[in-house]
Amino acid sequence: MMRKVITVVILLMGIFLSISTMALERTSLAICGDGGGWPPYHFEKERKVIGYDIDVLEAVFSPLGLTITVDLPPWQRCLRETNLGRYDIALSAAYSEERDKDYILTDYYYTLQPSYVYSSITYPEGLPIRTAQDIDGFRVCGLQGYNYTGFGVDDSKVRKNGKTFDQVVKMLEANRCDVFLARYEILAGFKASEGIDHLTNGLKVVSIPGISGDKFYMLISRSIPDGLELKSIFDQHIKQLRVSGELDRMIEKYIE
């Protein structure tokens, strides 16, 4: 019996060491995020990419001796080049069946509240939206390359013409759409991290009725040989950071 226990312990140690050794065999990770900005999760400040995402990456991978580089190209290019293996990981992605097929999804590491934004100048009484499905009856704007399935709406009906929040705000103010979709925490993040307030000139944000927080993941390329090992390392560490409360402390730095 003792011999069996020792054998099991040795096997478990071997698995752990093999994962750690794998991580140490590569010296760096190439990461990409949304060039349009996704504060407080990742954004550029004083020519440096910072934010919650980067803090999480460093907490997970820096102890393994990996150097982390983060670029912020347009989001669609980030996704495309991660798919091709030019980047190892894409940051802050909502779930979709297509992404689950094209990438290796990590465990989720934060949630956001899906909301819609409307103009109280155009609609002083607000909009008659009681369910997420009611939104489909309006002209809805969103950002290019984004997935709005988690908002409870028909993603195919969202006009994804804007490359940045500034552009979708202007589309709303020009009455080219009735609402635009966003996560409240991101809008708050722009104000807290960069001093940019997207909710001026009568714009109001409302949580979408009946929709709970949307989970966000990192997307690991299926074109790299150690993708599953990176996922295993990330998932193990993120669970520990969540249980210890460290994830909450990380985000509190950016949104108070």
What are these model-predicted stretches?
Residues 8-18:
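Bacterial N-terminal signal peptides
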Residues 24-97, 101-102, 142, 161, ...:
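Extracytoplasmic small-molecule ligand-binding "clamshell" domains
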Residues 35, 111-115, 197-235, 256:
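Periplasmic-binding protein-like
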Residues 36, 47-59, 119-156, 170, ...:
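Bilobed "Venus flytrap"/periplasmic-binding protein-like clamshell domains
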Residues 54-63, 123-124, 217-250:
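Extended ligand-binding regions for polar small-molecule ligands
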Residues 58, 67-134, 145-148, 204-211:
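Acidic, polar ligand-binding/catalytic clefts
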Residues 67, 145-160, 198-201, 233-256:
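Ligand-binding clefts/hinges and TM-proximal coupling segments of bilobed small-molecule sensing domains
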Residues 76-88, 104, 166-194:
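Short helices/loops that flank or line small-molecule/ion binding pockets
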